[in-house]
Design a protein with these regions (language model features):
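Gram-negative and organellar
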Residues: 19-415
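Hydrophobic h-region of N-terminal signal peptides that target proteins for export
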Residues: 11-20
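Sec-dependent signal peptide recognition
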Residues: 2-10
């Protein structure tokens, strides 16, 4: 622990020195930079309890950074969380590097706007809590932290994954209360060690949104999605999967802090080889609740849709529920909770997988820059059919203690 503390202090010193450097005035033109930036560094020691990982211990050094500019016409944001985990004693559990990077660039004009985003990740297992998806690292959980992607709804053990999701959205104002919405998404999921089904998906959507008043809006949207499987190391019969959905959405801003959103509609599913995935008509929908109060936030999300199968099935019907809550007390103590339930029913006769997780975290700001934290996470998964050995098939508990370097948010201004 003393060695880790020395390492953390050294890294903090280097980072602060870099941020504090004064760059001399250049003779040429400079690109103005303005925005808010924040970063954290964490060191944690983790114990795993349950099954083959009972009494295993590991250590994690991690960090996260976030930046958003102040531009109203060209908004840009960046968020990255990653680190490295190594085994201390017992059976190694998800050791190695991990990272999740998210970029977003917008263009806002008087009658139209364009939003481009990309999310890329490398992990040692399916994501659960926090932006990085790795439990016990010390990064924030709960609150408005986005739920894990539905492309990995099956919990795994020591399973390297590479994932990327590129998204584009275009909105055009047609009149005072009507706008045209167009978008597209391309996703990929890869298993470098060959212990999962590589999956690609492409989605195109279009629709209209009607603004009823300052707080309420309705929308109708059509979505086309195609799933394909370029790599299949599990020996399952695969086929291209196509879904068509029509969703009708209602959104309401109850206050400046509270927003609810819900959509529902029919979904038609068909496989290129109907012997593997026959044609079917289903229901697709989602609902969300967001509350951003003064000293914290809360969220609740539900999704019912057809997925590519979570890396272990050829298509799946997914029910996903995720909740988060965080609250700050007296500017020194923060408590946070997050949890989720994921049910994946294989299309055809592939069985049902039920996964769930829950986490609690306590953070204490010891001084202006340093924090201490403790967290507890529990994962559990059951399946009605046999799954590969790298799919979680037991209850796993994760207990973590650590320290962090967490300076206040910085505001950057240059002309």
């Amino acid at each position: 622990m003393k060695t880790a503390l020395k390492l953390l202090v050294f890294v903090v010193t280097v980072v602060n020195a870099a941020l504090a450097q004064v760059v001399p005035d250049a003779t040429g033109p400079r690109v103005p930079i303005s925005g808010s930036a924040h970063y954290d560094l964490h060191y944690s020691e983790i114990e795993y309890l349950g099954g083959s990982f009972n009494d295993s211990q590991s250590a994690v050094f991690s960090g996260d950074v976030a930046y958003a500019n102040f531009s109203e016409r060209l908004p840009f944001s960046l968020k990255d969380a990653g680190g490295y985990s190594w085994a201390v004693t017992g059976t190694p559990y998800e050791v190695g590097p991990f990272d999740n990077l998210s970029l977003s660039q917008g263009t806002v004009r008087r009658k139209w706007n364009l939003q481009l985003s990309d999310d890329a990740s490398y992990r040692q297992g399916a994501p659960t809590t926090g932006f990085s998806g790795v439990a016990g690292t010390g990064e924030p959980i709960g609150g408005s932290t986005p739920p894990p992607s539905t492309s990995q709804t099956i919990l795994t053990v020591n399973t390297k994954t590479v994932a990327n999701s590129a998204n584009g959205e275009f909105d055009r104002t047609l009149n005072f209360n009507t706008s045209l919405n167009l978008g597209g998404t391309s996703e990929l999921l890869r298993y470098p060690d060959g212990n999962g089904i590589d999956t690609d998906s492409q989605t195109a959507n279009g629709g209209l949104t009607w603004r009823l008043d300052a707080r309420n809006s309705l929308s109708a949207r059509y979505l086309f999605t195609q799933f394909s499987y370029p790599g299949n190391s599990l020996g399952l019969l695969t086929t291209t999967l196509i879904t068509n959905s029509a969703l009708f959405d209602y959104q309401r801003h109850w206050t400046r802090q509270i927003t609810t959103d819900g959509s529902v509609g029919p979904e038609w599913v068909v496989g290129a080889n109907s012997a593997i995935i026959p044609f079917s008509t289903r229901i697709s929908g989602n609902a969300s609740f967001q509350d951003q109060f003064r000293f914290g936030s809360a969220s609740l999300n539900y999704r019912h849709t057809t997925s590519g199968g979570g890396g272990f099935l050829v298509g799946g019907e997914v029910d996903s529920v995720n909740a988060g809550f965080s609250k700050e007390f007296s500017k020194k103590v923060t408590t946070a909770f997050s949890g989720g339930y994921m049910r994946t029913v294989g299309l055809g006769t592939q069985g049902t997988i039920d996964g769930k997780f829950g986490a609690a975290m306590f953070t204490w700001r010891m001084s202006r820059f340093f924090t201490a934290f403790a967290s507890y996470t529990a994962d559990d998964q059951e399946s009605s059919s046999s799954l590969p050995s790298n799919a979680l098939n037991q209850t796993l508990q994760v207990i973590s203690f650590g320290i962090g370097f967490s300076p206040r948010e910085k505001h950057l201004e240059s002309q």
